[in-house]
Amino acid sequence: MLRAFTREGRIVSLPARWSKKLLLLDVVAQSFEPGRAYAETEVNAILREWYEHDWVSLRRYLVDAGMLDRRDGWYWRIGGTFEL
């Protein structure tokens, strides 16, 4: 399913349907280490590697989906799939 939206490990387009978008966001969220705080510039750099075209929307979707949280320019992972 994700192959339709990715090429060579990068996002080429975001799914329109929220359910598909959540699957893609879950994969992206795994780029962030649980328990670590990231400056906004770090988050932007990581997300640009995934989707250079519109990393700002990608960041907003991660927050809206409850996978990242933010405060005062800092972000941390709060959701998505975690490996035990």
Where do the protein language model's features map onto the residues?
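Short amphipathic alpha-helical interaction segments
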Residues: 50-61
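Short alpha-helical segments that sit at the start of domains
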Residues: 1-34
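A short, conserved structural fragment
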Residues: 64-73
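Hydrophobic alpha-helical segments that drive targeting, anchoring, or assembly
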Residues: 20-21, 46-47, 76
